[in-house]
Swiss-Prot record:
InterPro entries: Cellulose_deg_GH3, Fn3-like, Glyco_hydro_3_AS, Glyco_hydro_3_C, Glyco_hydro_3_C_sf, Glyco_hydro_3_N, Glyco_hydro_3_N_sf, Glycoside_hydrolase_SF. Its main location: secreted. Keywords: Carbohydrate metabolism, Cellulose degradation, Glycoprotein, Glycosidase, Hydrolase, Polysaccharide degradation, Secreted, Signal. Transmembrane segments: none annotated. The gene is bglF. GO terms for cellular component: extracellular region. The active site is at D285. This is Probable beta-glucosidase F. It holds the Pfam family Glyco_hydro_3_C.
Amino acid sequence: MAHRWLILALVAAAAPRALASPGPSLNERQSDDEPFSPPYYPAPNGGWVSTWAEAYEKAHSIVSNLTLAEKVNLTTGTGIFMGPCAGQTGSVPRLGIPNLCLHDSPLGVRNTDHNTAFPPGITVGATFDKSLMYERGVGLGEEARGKGVNVLLGPSVGPLGRKPRGGRNWEGFGFDPVLQGIGGAETIKGMQSTGLIACIKHFVGNEQEMHRMSSVVTQGYSSNIDDRTLHELYIWPFAEGVRAEVGSVMIAYNDVNKSSCSQNSKLINGVLKDELGFQGFVVTDWLAHYGGVSSALAGLDMDMPGDGAVPLFGNSYWGPELSRSILNGTVPVERLNDMVTRILATWYKMGQDQDYPLPNFSSNTEDEKGLLYPGAVISPIGVVNQYVNVQGNHNITARAIARDAITLLKNEGDLLPLRRNDSLKVFGTDAGPDPQGLNSCADKGCNRGVLTMGWGSGTSKLPYLITPQEAIANITPTAEFFITDSFPSSVDANDEDIAIVFINSDSGENYITVDGNPGDRKTSGLHAWHNGDELVKAAAERFSQVVVVIHTVGPIILEEWIDLDSVKAVLIAHLPGQEAGYSLTDVLFGDYSPSGHLPYTIPYQESNYPSSVGLLQQPFGQIQDYYTEGLYIDYRHFLKEDITPRYAFGHGLSYTTFEFSEPALSVVTPLDSAYPPSRPAKGPTPTYPNTIPPASEAAWPAKFNRIWRYIYPYLNNPQADAAVANSSKTYPYPDGYSTDPQPPPRAGGAEGGNPALWDVAFSVQVTVTNTGQHSGRAVAQLYVELPDSLGLDTPSRQLRQFEKTKVLETGQSETLTLEVTRKDVSVWDVEVQDWKTVVGGEGVKIHIGESVLDIRTECEVGGRCVTL
């Protein structure tokens, strides 16, 4: 999401052409060189999943009594800066339905006070700890609920990390669909356990910040993705989120296969709502609404923040235009009823009808009193900030995540952990505070002091910050600090001194440019910012023992100094949030052994990546971003091309050592067929009269006090609009548009897809023993290798599961059980449009280790298990 209100949105994207097949695959082509997203109409109704039945029944009762204006009011935002939240819908006061508050961010409540700034997703992913993923979700839910937020805009599982320089990779959990999927699902479960509605984003193909948005000058880029790649990589984590019963899905700005995501009927109607069985509501990213009728027919349910192509004028593609489209018969009444039913069913399912708080903060001002509608020329004034403290004890969870994510890349001579009486000299501005003050940059749009998070809408204010400088000083008062990015000439270096050098690499969202980087790491590349490499080299020249601490949004090139003799230890502390200092000293001084693992690959050089994942730029015309690398991103590419990385995906050392032994595999649900059993039939969905409502339902109420710019559902002359329905005028519907229901997709049947896909095919056990001299935790990472008999080019190893041990003392063991589902050992069959596996699992190999290249045990289905 972005609040850059000067961005202009393109009015509409080209309509797709019709195909004869009732179930075409994504990116079928009209010609050899033109991507194509086939039509999929009509929008499937929600309510057929049994676990949502009660919520849909309640919603049906309400929707049956709503007027046209009230229905439209719940689908349309009130306008940018027209309320306390990033966006809010209209309300239905007579039935007790409030404006629904939608607000950022995935790591904490944005632009407010007395909140927790949790570590971002990339840090959470590095823990490889499902319990911490869930606990953070609970914390996010409790805080957002406490502030009166109905929908928190997170978690983010798109971008997936296809482009290493991508600006918002740090908001997600790692560069792998399973790591993203598990991280997203656990976060959703935690968030929604509190009654908050989670909003998984960005669906889909938002892998680059530059040129993602459409304007009156140019159209946002098109991510051109083949059907198999889209299913096996980019949709995978969204399927896990839908299976976790996520309440809402945010649509991305960009096109996919030359059709805008917000009106891409194949993606929303066909994949998300029909194949994945999504029961909640679909919302735009902010100002990502490019057409009114087209998006409604394509399955969009809510428009945020409500404005049309030119914001701040009170115009909308929906609002009164949606009322008009219903009255003149362009948009079927059934479609509007389903939109509103989905929104209210989600509200009921989370229990938000029961004493749920109203917003008690304003994202527009820090003052207690302020404008209620800051975007209006004349606005009433009232209390907008009540300064409700929602932090609770969430600092404990935040510190645990930041600590358990710390990834030890190198530790020669066991220099770490440090002793409290070591002679330490600390270098780098990344160790210290922002000299201009805490939260001095809006949305973290600067890189000063320790890097706690990237920049953009996916941030929150820091309630406090203990920097590494402060934390180290509290433990070793004799440490000397040089908070500068130029190595001081006056530093004395003794043999017993240990230099700790702090460096970082930042990125963020495209509406802010920092040091020449417009969101994506365009200028900096994958290198340290602020002279970081030179600072390390200078310290390595003067000191015989150097520890490097890196705060980074993603992969970073280390080659200028990583092999220098004096660089003994390297830690990646990722993005630690508010607990940057003590989470680091917990590990540096040995109170905890590092247990984080890389959620991405660190290459020797950027040229190790395929050329297709570089940033794309052009001043005019639509950028066509072809995903020609297919399934081969990050570690999958390195394995395929036999490129040894500097540090592999999943790599992470400890202060101790672990042995993996006694692997065992058992068959749980036999894979008796190549394809899953037949999907369950759809249950009934709510039904309503489909007659066009009276025009009077969209008329302005008498003596209504309008607020200029506020988006209302009312029409000045609704009778004239209603008369059009009986005229000879017809709307130019997209090619392929139909109101005839589609046959149920064979890969569907429940939330996430055919429930048989999650049948446990194999259970794998492995015993992990601490064989070192320090307590610690190990991560067992399970990778699947599929046989050539499937007849498809498939990555040689794919992460499919992971488990983390408890803290193991020296000599202590724990047996871990990792489950492998049917889907885990399947590929997407483009022709059949279903998931295909090897009958009996014959030839499937299961690898377990501490990274993708550090495999400790191997099992072959139908064969034996061995320890390597």
